[in-house]
């Protein structure tokens, strides 16, 4: 095991231990939760190393980066999570690689995703903006 991979394994293990501790404190089991490893600005080779360490859920918040990485890593058993604001015009493309989209914030985006041809249904999570900051993503609570 390389030094960098050892460090990566140690960091992943520390995160998993923290999740297990928090789950226990909340009266839950860690295996009830899903760890989504976000690899923003890191190469696809890092995702490949993470899979070797047992990671299967990967998150990205930039469409182009997610699209490229998912295309490069089709040989791996991964679940791709899109966690960034998604432009309606890119929704159909995202639907081709994303297993889950965590930033649904408007009806037009739902319609665009619904019209995409996908082999597996996409898990969709509505993002709500609870702040007064219009620059933040998410639907208004009244919507």
State the predicted function of each range.
Residues 1-143:
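Conserved alpha/beta-domain cores
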């Amino acid at each position: 095991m390389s030094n960098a991979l050892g460090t990566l394994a140690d960091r992943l293990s520390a995160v998993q231990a923290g999740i297990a501790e928090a789950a226990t404190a909340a009266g839950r089991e860690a295996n009830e939760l899903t760890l989504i490893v976000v690899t923003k600005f890191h190469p696809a080779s890092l995702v490949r190393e993470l899979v070797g360490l047992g990671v299967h859920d990967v998150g990205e918040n930039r469409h182009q980066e997610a699209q490229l990485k998912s295309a490069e890593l089709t040989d791996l058993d991964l679940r791709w999570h899109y966690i960034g604001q998604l432009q309606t015009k890119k929704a159909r493309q995202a639907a081709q690689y994303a297993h889950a989209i965590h930033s649904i914030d408007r009806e037009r985006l739902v319609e665009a995703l619904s019209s995409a041809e996908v082999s597996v249904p996409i898990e969709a999570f509505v993002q709500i903006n609870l702040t007064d900051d219009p620059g933040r993503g998410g639907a208004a609570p009244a919507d």
